[in-house]
A protein has these predicted regions:
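Conserved alpha/beta enzyme-core scaffold
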Residues: 1-203
Length: 203
């Protein structure tokens, strides 16, 4: 209860699908006993019904950013039952790194797979996953076998960004330039669970 969870997901793709449903069940059971149980949710953008709808339906989200398209969550926001920060998507990661948004307790990130040397094969979206994995105290990974193995190699994860005043231009000058890694990095000491799923994306 009260934790801030950074979840993967961007335009209905690559969001976690198992853990949010299980969390919603726990929250509903706690509320039935009269216990207060809500979480703060950060994402890359919109997600899917297994995340926003499931948690909003049981009044499980205390605070949400930066974007929402779920009708159940929208009703909670507009009625004042859920706090919401409608911010530009590009501002989320820098503000998280600068500490403006507070502590990130848990990262819950869907991946396509994990390499033998511990690198993460990104799923069908990346969003703020790099930031969540770096900033969170604990990490839960959802490995989704529904996602195509062909996703390995199409991403370009850039690890050269810095905060002002040390920030420099991203060295991307041509449409076919690659400046980063095919994989997301993770500290294995922070990984507390790996959950398997085969559920499809909303989009």
């Amino acid at each position: 209860p009260g934790m801030t969870v950074g979840m993967s997901g961007f335009t209905g793709s690559g969001y976690p699908k198992e853990v949010p449903l299980a969390l919603a069940e726990q929250i509903e059971e706690a509320h039935a006993k009269g216990e207060d149980f809500r979480v703060r949710v950060w994402t890359g953008a919109s997600t899917g019904p297994e995340l926003d709808a499931a948690l909003a339906k049981v009044d499980g989200i205390e605070f949400r950013l930066p974007y929402n398209s779920d009708p159940i969550a929208r009703e909670k926001i507009n009625s004042g039952k859920m706090d919401y920060f409608d911010m530009h998507l590009s501002q989320v990661a820098p503000m998280a790194w600068q500490g403006f948004l507070g502590k990130l307790d848990v990262a819950l990130v869907e991946v396509t797979g994990i390499t033998p040397d511990g690198l993460l094969i990104p799923s069908s979206s990346v969003g703020n996953n790099k930031t969540w994995l770096a900033r969170a105290d604990k990490i839960i990974l959802e490995v989704n076998s529904w996602q195509s193995p062909a996703l390995e190699g199409i991403h370009d994860i850039y690890y050269g960004t810095q905060l002002p005043p040390l920030r420099v231009p991203i060295p991307l000058v041509r449409a076919d330039d690659r400046i980063g890694s095919k994989y997301l990095q993770v500290d294995p000491a922070k990984v507390v669970a790996v959950v398997e799923t085969d559920k499809p994306d909303r989009n």
